[in-house]
Amino acid sequence: MINHNKTPNILAKVFKRTCGLVSTGAALAILSQAASAACTYTIDSEWSTGFTANITLKNDTGAAINNWNVNWQYSSNRMTSGWNANFSGTNPYNATNMSWNGSIAPGQSISFGLQGEKNGSTAERPTVTGAACNSATTSSVASSSSTPTTSSSSASSVASALLLQEAQAGFCRVDGTIDNNHTGFTGSGFANTNNAQGAAVVWAIDATSSGRRTLTIRYANGGTANRNGSLVINGGSNGNYTVSLPTTGAWTTWQTATIDVDLVQGNNIVQLSATTAEGLPNIDSLSVVGGTVRAGNCGSVSSSSSVQSSSSSSSTPSQTCELKAPLRWTSTGPLISPKNPGWISIKDPSIVKYNDTYHVYATYYDTAYRSMYTSFTDWNTAQQAPHISMNGSRVGNTVAPQVFYFRPHNKWYLITQWAGAYATTDDIRNPNWSAKQKLLQGEPNGALDFWVICNDTHCYLYFSRDDGVLYVSKTTLANFPNFSGYSIVMEDHRGNGNSYLFEAANVYKLDGQNRYLLMVEAYISGPRFFRSWTATSLDGPWTPLADTEANPFAGNNNVEWSTGKWADGISHGELIRSGHDEKMTVDPCNLEFLYQGASGPGSTYNTIPYKLGLLRLKK
């Protein structure tokens, strides 16, 4: 259960320090360029015993910085965990880049985060040092609700940065000329569009998977007014964005504008067009961060017809597979097991595959129910990834979570209990989400295991009460996440009154089909299993698919154990989605189910040693 002690709302403090970054060269001890960065140490949240902080490194120079290495030391505070960097040392602490964030392009920044204990003191603001740092800094104060730009990721995460400049692969065209008459550009010149509305610069980006990417446009606007742009992905089929490009004061003064967009798997054509008759500012470069990306093909655009939305599908199904009973699964052994001191179980997982990385939020139990986050790129190394506790963070514990990206708000949402609540973040890798907010007005007693899915017009909130009834609340897409009232989806009071329709409802949209899948956990004569139904609308009616103990959606009776049976029953979990947004799409041709399995008995339910395993549907 959740710790109901409220974390004090402390105004986050930001202190900037200067630090040096190691630049690559013939010898690491000698910098090939006098590249430096400004380091910002941010107290993100603080409570009675601990704190979370972020260190942001910003490249204020005109040259790329490669391979950074920073240090800091506390008087009384101690670091307990961190993310988005490789850490070593025990006060002083050292952080070095991971494989995907070691290069910082001019004007760009990276961040890493940490959690610590105050040890009777206040949250300290240590000086961050490095090998070479000449950049001036100033102090500032940030809102306590600020969200770090980057954060948690396991050491196995892989991503890449792409820099597109004129006369290079991936630069497709400019409606104008390539000029070099103003200093400060970084390539062979800069793109100077015609002074006309609609004049454009076009790039091509090849992404290995669908997902969110961060685009940074380096530009100079020496005019007296904004020269804003309209950014279109694949002709508008995968996104339309407005980019603010204010004046920089001179044509030799370069600044950056950053925007998060959704790219589809394969080739993407990105077009930035002028919205005024003055045309665009001078455009020096476009950089792309997130996932694995490379220069694309200017002559083609990946078809978006098989991708339901800019983030609704990370795969392109080549066939339509009918999901019909009986179903057969194979199970892995335990892939994620308790490894932190005192942890007894890990259960109730929510899993999102985003930018080639699996992100898992889950419940763990030590002396109470708490929450954790982990991420990895390969199931074979899942257990080696850090298990980061969310206990004491701003969001607190988020038992039985569901995580997804809500496109209309351009934010990640986490749905949790008790009572029903939601939290948000701009970065799924950051386990310090916003403070929880109420989800359902008029929520009945005992409501749990909340699940959200949306179509093009409405969002649906499913939940249980351990009373043999499945409930739903409905709101418009524009009104999300505000739900009010509820109705009954179905009820089944056989057995002891709740065992046939128990908990852990999941609802998904099947890729390429006008068909939805509903799963609900049950227990009848033996261990837990899942029943299932399908419908052509989220409003129902729901038709049984595999809904008995003998013919379950997933349970002991239809699972083969490739490495030996280790779990008794198939309990609370999620299918691995083909996308990551609110439409909850799954590929019926390649279903995988991350579930909690009881690996042994417990003296009480709370002490059952649950672990996480993966089911794969047999074809």
Swiss-Prot record:
One family name in Pfam for this protein: CBM_2
Domain CBM2: 38-136
Enzyme Commission designation: 3.2.1.55
Xref: PROSITE patterns: CBM2, CBM2_A, CBM6
Signal peptide annotation: 1-37
Domain CBM6: 163-289
Disulfide bonds: 39-133
Keyword Kinase part of the UniProt annotation: no
Keyword Disulfide bond: yes
Region named Disordered: 300-319
Subcellular location, principal: secreted
Cell compartments where the protein resides: Secreted
Recorded GO CC terms: extracellular region
Record GO biological process: L-arabinose metabolic process
Additional note from the record: Acts only on high MW substrates, in which arabinose is linked to a polymeric backbone.
Function: Xylanase C contributes to hydrolyze hemicellulose, the major component of plant cell-walls.
Protein's name in the database: Alpha-L-arabinofuranosidase C
Annotated source species: Cellvibrio japonicus (strain Ueda107)
Lineage, top ranks: Bacteria, Pseudomonadati, Pseudomonadota, Gammaproteobacteria, Cellvibrionales
Gene that encodes it: xynC
